[in-house]
Amino acid sequence: MLLAFLNGTYIGNCSFTGVSTSRYQHRATMGIALYQKYTGMGIGRAMIEKLLEIAKEKGYEQMELEVVADNQRAIRLYESIGFQMYGKLPDNMKYLDGTYADAYWMMRKL
C-alpha cells in the first residue's frame, strides 16, 4: 500500500492485490482513494504510476480496476496512463439513498 501525505497530513492511498488462483497469478487489481481537494494536482497519477512499477517488479503482467461509470475525471486519468475499458457492470453500486451506479472494468498490460 502506498500512502500519500502533504505537509504531514494524510491525503490518500493506493494499493493492489494479486489474483490468487494459479492460472490468474499474472493479474492484479488496484484501488485508489484521494481526498477530493487534492485531485488535479498529479498526486493520483504519481501514486498509480509508482504502484504499476511495483506490480511489474513483482512479476504481475496486467493491472485491473473498477471505476464508477460517471466518474469521468478518473476514467480520463486511467486512460491517459494506458488503461482500457473492457466491460460494464450495471447497478454495481447501491448508494444509501437507494440509487444505483454502473461501473466499468479497466485493464492495462504492465
Where do the language-model regions lie?
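Conserved GNAT acetyl-CoA-binding A-motif
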Residues: 48, 55-66
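Conserved catalytic-core motifs of GNAT/GCN5-like acyltransferases
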Residues: 64-67, 79, 84-99
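Short glycine/proline-centered loop/turn elements that form peptide/ligand docking sites
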Residues: 44, 48, 71-74, 91-96
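Acetyl-CoA-dependent GNAT
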Residues: 1-37, 48-49, 54, 109-110
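Terminal substrate-recognition subdomain of acyl/acetyltransferases
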Residues: 102-110
